[in-house]
């Protein structure tokens, strides 16, 4: 059950870095050493127990280190709608240093990534300690921090709403991936297999949909398909 006080409403759309930074400041005001899970609302998780275990493992990792953690998914196709993580040396406890981030590559490059075995999908599921992510923002996104840090004694009080309404719209429009994850040198990845899918791409929707014997998927329509295989048909 969520309490109304646990819901933070953005007064303007400014991509993912500002809202995550605001949440970190707000949570730190309530718990100065909190560990956070960042989870997009439109992702599908089919294996809940495996997912829960991955989250517990990840939170334990970030609670004892100043590291930013993302969950990586082994790709089963050259998807151009996802970001990719190239893994570096393992830490010995099931985590890997991130070597590179690549955001939504062209098809040919995505094919190379999948064939190499070194690249994993970036799930967009992140974990970190509040102080670690705020420190990263201070280094890499000083313009953003200049808008939100002055409210450090205001967060989680009755004055927070007015402060955010005044300052949040002036935050730079930047994603957490581009603003921090692609630039920080303390990013690690844990590889997961918990039935993850980002429903924001046609490929992921196809994988999850019922198909006919020729591999065709028909959504929101009745269609007659002649001599067609592995298609997806969607009518508005």
Where are these regions (language model features)?
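Short, structured coil segments at secondary-structure junctions
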Residues: 1-3, 185
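Short glycine- and hydrophobic/aromatic-rich loop-to-beta-strand nucleating segment
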Residues: 124-128
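A short, charged helix-loop
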Residues: 87-120, 155
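Solvent-exposed alpha-helices and their adjacent loops that cap or buttress functional pockets
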Residues: 29-31, 37-38, 45, 61-63, ...
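Fold-independent oxyanion-binding glycine-rich loops
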Residues: 11, 39-41, 48, 72-75, ...
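Conserved beta-loop-beta/alpha segment of the NTase-like Rossmann-fold superfamily
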Residues: 5-90, 135, 139-140
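Left-handed beta-helix
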Residues: 130-236
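Alpha-helical scaffold segments in soluble metabolic enzymes
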Residues: 22, 26, 57-64, 84, ...
């Amino acid at each position: 059950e969520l309490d109304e006080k646990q819901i933070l409403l953005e007064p303007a759309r400014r991509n993912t870095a500002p809202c995550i930074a605001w949440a970190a400041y707000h949570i730190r005001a309530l718990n100065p050493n909190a560990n956070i899970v960042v989870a997009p609302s439109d992702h599908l998780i089919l294996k809940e127990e495996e997912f829960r275990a991955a989250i517990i493992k990840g939170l334990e990792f970030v609670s004892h280190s100043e590291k930013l953690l993302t969950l990586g998914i082994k790709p089963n196709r050259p998807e151009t709608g996802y970001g990719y993580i190239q893994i570096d040396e393992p830490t010995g406890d099931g985590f890997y240093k991130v070597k590179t981030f690549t955001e939504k590559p062209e098809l040919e490059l995505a094919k190379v990534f999948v064939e190499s075995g070194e690249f994993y999908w970036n799930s967009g599921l992140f974990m970190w300690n509040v102080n670690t992510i705020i420190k990263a923002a201070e280094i890499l996104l000083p313009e953003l921090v200049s808008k939100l840090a002055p409210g450090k004694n205001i967060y989680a009080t009755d004055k927070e709403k007015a402060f955010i309404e005044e300052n949040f719209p002036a935050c730079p429009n930047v994603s957490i991936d581009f603003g921090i994850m692609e630039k920080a040198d303390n990013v690690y990845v844990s590889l997961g297999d918990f039935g993850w899918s980002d429903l924001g791409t046609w490929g992921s929707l196809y994988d999850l949909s019922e198909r006919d014997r020729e591999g065709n998927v028909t959504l929101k329509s009745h269609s007659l398909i002649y001599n067609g295989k592995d298609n997806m048909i969607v009518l508005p």
